[in-house]
Amino acid sequence: MRPALALCLLCPAFWPRPGNGEHPTADRAACSASGACYSLHHATFKRRAAEEACSLRGGTLSTVHSGSEFQAVLLLLRAGPGPGGGSKDLLFWVALERSISQCTQEKEPLRGFSWLHPDSEDSEDSPLPWVEEPQRSCTVRKCAALQATRGVEPAGWKEMRCHLRTDGYLCKYQFEVLCPAPRPGAASNLSFQAPFRLSSSALDFSPPGTEVSAMCPGDLSVSSTCIQEETSAHWDGLFPGTVLCPCSGRYLLAGKCVELPDCLDHLGDFTCECAVGFELGKDGRSCETKVEEQLTLEGTKLPTRNVTATPAGAVTNRTWPGQVYDKPGEMPQVTEILQWGTQSTLPTIQKTPQTKPKVTGTPSGSVVLNYTSSPPVSLTFDTSSTVVFILVSIAVIVLVVLTITVLGLFKLCFHKSRSSRTGKGALDSPGVECDAEATSLHHSSTQCTDIGVKSGTVA
């Protein structure tokens, strides 16, 4: 009982907790086609703690050069005011500082400050001004933070002491290739879980390792992972041009399912695409059946379901024909447990068993999705040590009980052996006495015989 209590008391010491003043639900991320991703975090950290937090996520404290980098940061800021609700100006740590050997340069745009990670491709200085002019100094190290008006509009740079706390920080991540945003089709409730421990409902580009989950009609849950190859990246189980969830109609708009009247809108401010198994007609608005696949629009075929068992787990194969479903209730039902959401700064990710789709094309135009259930993976607190400790404790207790039992049996047998020997000795003593008496009687009878003989002789 005491070891178990001690283990329970030690659990909080090893279980990671969010940092002071963190607001993980307000964090957000964005990626550009160049392979750079940025994340914004609301947390009252010092400069060094902010650098460690970015490093823990696999990135560095962000620079904010002009051009695409500034636009990405601007997009993150304008996505929402954050936990303050836009009631005050916010400060965010960036990788801008002035070392001890550098002096204040009043005529330079950065006033003698420099970026920790210079960008050769985007070497132009940031267009942001200084909210307050830095103090003149050549002997004191100073840091700079990005000030955002009401937390959404960048106002400029502000000199700060590095040991002070700000309202948040910006991180930057660099990847060689990215996956484009998947086409949702009829999918809803999209959630992107990025490898730098942030989740988002929408990402134009996703780095390798990102997992996307969505709900299809009929409460069917699907997921896919961005996988990197030699020179490109793609979503696992999704062929180019396919969607996460098939549409119940024949038309697509920007990768999403649309109704027929919307697609045939006379304004012509968008283009129409056809679902799998159909092709766009000559008029550019109607969908026609592909001749080589010999599909018909009459009726709807019910999906077939084959369930087989493999050593890795149950695999469910679902075949969706080229025709589409008019009733969502006809879709096969699959129960899946997913855990998506924003994580805190520290690495506390835990995933539940997931079902990953693999799409296979057939000559008949059908699309087959293979859902394989993988075992749960725990990336944080492992309970195997607790199980081992309990098993070892039980084994020790059983060994002690067996030892005590064996000693008791040995002691009992020893006492029985001594008592049996004592009884046997007592029985042997009367026998000796009987033999002595018999010998004495025999000797007396012998004497009597001799006396009788002698008497006869005398007579």
Curated annotation (Swiss-Prot):
Cytoplasmic topological intervals: 408-459
Record protein name field: C-type lectin domain family 14 member A
Higher taxonomy: Eukaryota, Metazoa, Chordata, Craniata, Vertebrata
Membrane topology of the entry: Single-pass type I membrane protein
Record has Disulfide bond as a keyword: yes
Principal location listed in the UniProt entry: membrane
Protein species of origin: Mus musculus
Record domain EGF-like: where: 246-288
Residues carrying Phosphoserine: S440
One annotated Gene Ontology cellular component of this protein: external side of plasma membrane
SS bond partners: C143-C162
InterPro entries cross-referenced by the UniProt entry: C-type_lectin-like (IPR001304), C-type_lectin-like/link_sf (IPR016186), C-type_lectin_domain (IPR051505), CTDL_fold (IPR016187)
GO BP: any one term: vascular endothelial growth factor receptor-3 signaling pathway
Membrane-traversing stretches: 387-407
Swiss-Prot/TrEMBL keywords: Disulfide bond, EGF-like domain, Glycoprotein, Lectin, Membrane, Phosphoprotein, Signal, Transmembrane, Transmembrane helix
